[in-house]
Amino acid sequence: KCHHEQNINKMGGLRFSMPITFVTFTVAGLSLIGVPGMSGFFSKDLIIDIFKYNNNYIIYYMLVVSIVVTTLYTTKIFFKVFFGTNKLKVQKSNDLEHNKTLLIPLIVLAIPSAIIGWALFDTLVFNHFFSDSITDGNTLSYFYQNYIINSVNFFLHSFTSLSFLALLIGLLLSYFHYHKKNKISNNILVKIPMIKNILLNEYGFNQLSNSLIPNN
């Protein structure tokens, strides 16, 4: 209900009172940050590899850094909304997840978020799907046809990639800072105020949108 509390800092513990929302958000979140095996992982790593194997290293490293950022803001919502103390004192009831108009789309969209990458991998890679893009897709196709071969090998190969390391860094930082309230992560923010200011200002996106889009 949009007219109720929207500040995630005032939420917590909602995984028990909104279990379906919790499960579908978890699936969608894992896909968004590109956890190996999820649909978002296939699309993310394919895009990253396009730049890597075409020697566009500046964009490649920018994308790797963006994985950490994406992981941080996604898991921040996850920990603050669904874990910790139930600050809203919300009890499990049919009133919270009673509307099929909302629940059915959540469930329907969560399913392909988990599995569609496996189904489309061969089509995207081995049928030269990227050959007409702005980069040389044939280089990528050659690499996958000769070294990766199939989606299972691509999945296993991902655990040795730099993007997976970036994912782990983002997960660990988020877990200790947002969930465990670790003193080390808090000290890092205190000693490096620039990082704290960037996070508090939400990367400047709100200021940018407010300056470009009229309030009325």
Language model: regions and residue ranges:
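Short amphipathic alpha-helical coupling elements at transmembrane boundaries
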Residues: 3, 9-16, 46, 83-84, ...
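Membrane-interface interhelical loops and short amphipathic "cap" helices
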Residues: 41-57, 127-137
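Phosphate/oxyanion-binding loops and surfaces in catalytic or ligand/nucleic-acid-binding neighborhoods
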Residues: 30-33, 71, 81, 85, ...
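Alpha-helical transmembrane segments of polytopic integral membrane proteins
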Residues: 44-45, 71-75, 79, 210, ...
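Predominantly late transmembrane helices and immediately cytosolic-facing juxtamembrane segments
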Residues: 54-95, 163-188
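Membrane-interface and transmembrane segments of multi-pass membrane proteins
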Residues: 102-216
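Interfacial and helix-entry/exit segments of alpha-helical transmembrane bundles
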Residues: 2-38, 48, 54-67, 91-115
